[in-house]
Amino acid sequence: MTNHYAVIGRPINHTKSPLIHSLFAATTGQDLEYGAIEGSPEDFAGDVQRFRAQGGQGLNVTAPFKLQAFQLATESSERARLARAANTLKFEGEQVLAENFDGIGLLRDIEVNLGQPLAGTRVLLLGAGGAVRGALLPFLAAGPTELVMANRDGRKAAELAQEIGHPLLSVRSYAALEGETFDLVINATSASLVGELPPVPAGVFTQAALAYELAYGKGLTPFLRLAREQGVAQLADGVGMLVEQAAEAFAWWRGVRPETRPVIDQLTLPLT
């Protein structure tokens, strides 16, 4: 029997998820169909219910529905509860189970695919939105010496840090980053989506081994261009994170984790 899954978001025409999951299914021998649903902001719960009624067994969830997906769940993982957002749902009988694989997907891309272990490093996370919330637990568990958040809205970042309450997690204003250096700098702001640069001092890159842009398919964004100008040897966008979180969802649904490297290689565009 063919199993049915989909991604739901708005807009959804840009999504790579059907391609990714079809490649996963082909390489693992799983019999499934995977589609895309343009969700309704006014009736997300109805969209989910209709998909379930048609035999759907799980959903990947993208913007702007991750909070609604979390609220819809009857049971949520610790990662989803911390992020207050779900990027994957699984349906078991009457239960709606919620997970958030964004952070673990990002961590796996950085450590495994890009060869940059977080243990013993100073990490700078730009932003304090859902992507950062989802990354904090996996990142802190990886053993950095310090994890610093910087955000335009300093209060939002401070409240998040207080909520986490971890001794290795701290908050800076962008201005307070002047004179500081980091081993890894990650841009999780929305600035690159509109071709802008977060107001980060150029000096944060001078000792960095990797600059990572969560947006993908945007080429050499202003953030990555500044990092390259400051001598950062390794630049990456978020396509690896996209594929790795998809693999985590696939494994949660199907019980088998697909190989990700061939899919990442197929989807990666040059950073030019």
Segments predicted by a language model, with ranges:
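Phosphate/diphosphate ligand-binding glycine-rich loop within oxidoreductases
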Residues: T2-L114
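Helix N-cap at the beta1-alpha1 junction of Rossmann-like dinucleotide-binding domains, i.e.
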Residues: I12-N13, G154-R155, K218
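Glycine-rich adenosine-cofactor-binding loop
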Residues: G9, N100-G103, I110, L114, ...
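NAD(P)-binding Rossmann-fold cofactor-contacting core
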Residues: P144-I164
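Adenosine-phosphate binding glycine-rich loop
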Residues: G120, L214-T272
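Short glycine-rich anion-binding loops that position phosphate/pyrophosphate groups of nucleotides
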Residues: T62-F70, G129-A131, S190-L193, G217
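Rossmann-like adenosine-cofactor binding region
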Residues: H166-L235, G240
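Mobile, glycine- and charge-enriched loop segments
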Residues: S22, A26-T27, D31-I37, L107-L125, ...
